[in-house]
Amino acid sequence: MAPRNSLEAGAHVVLFNRDIKPGGLAEYGIFPTKHKMKQGLRKQFRAILAHPRLDYYGNCSIGEKGALTLADVQTLGFDALVVAAGAQGTRQLGIPGEDAIGVMHAKDVVYHYNHLPPFSQRALPLGKRVAIVGMGNVMIDIAHFLLRLRACVEEVVVVARRGPAERKYDAKEYRYIEPFVDQQALQHEILRLRPRLEAVGQDVAVLMAEMTGNGQATRPPDCPGRLTFRFLASPHRMLTDAAGRVRGLAVEENRLVRQQGDVSARGTGEYVELPVDTVIFAIGDRVDESLGLPYARGQFVTNPHPDAADPLVSAYQTYDPILSGTNFASGA
């Protein structure tokens, strides 16, 4: 944590936070029932906020659209400005219909069930058949929420660009959704993809055992929904009705390509329509450019006039050199 490191270095820290409560994703990004993890992180934040050399200002957004701009903060007399805001922008795929009614992004759901304003005040209009695009831990949390706490959801369809071997979620997290997995449908899906999986040397029997387990997970009696997978499928466009609401998701069938040990997906030009009425993208976020920092995708922004005496000049050097002093500001 930037504030703790600065305090340990003897600095006086002023912490600006967009939210009222401190914690960021530690507070608003973790599934609500993971009490032990949340309490442990909250204890750390309480200790930091209690430090006599830290001043905390919550409900104060920083950026071009915020209460203060970065330029404003730089005029307040600090010797250094540390931005620890993470990626708060929404990542878009740029496909047709991405702004249709019924299309959401992970933060819309995660911040809603974690009670972060203004997301918690917004309605969450879910249909009966929900597609979640993505195969990471966030997908697990959203599927868990939909199937365990939203009785209106009859089916969650996980749409993955690559195959079961490339799943990104932690194995221990899978136990939260395993009781809802339609094991027969999962086996059928893996067998459907056998030629494409074996073409890159993947063992279907091993994948089947890893994904299906013993099939003995107990489904909660009051949760009738099921979870299915659609692997090797890339979102192509939203299908909408006359009112602009989602009625389906068109996906492109993919094949796997192995290059230098890495497996990637390539489109086949074949398309399939999935009948869903809600689509949630859990594909990560992007930097919010309105924060006011120099931004370039896939690279660091470095000092245009680097210090040649810096031994790490070829690896990294800050854009705005830090001056000597003991007063630091941190944005979160």
Language-model-detected regions and their locations in the chain:
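Glycine-/small-residue-rich beta->alpha transition segments that form the dinucleotide
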Residues: F78-A80, A84-R91, N254, V276-E289
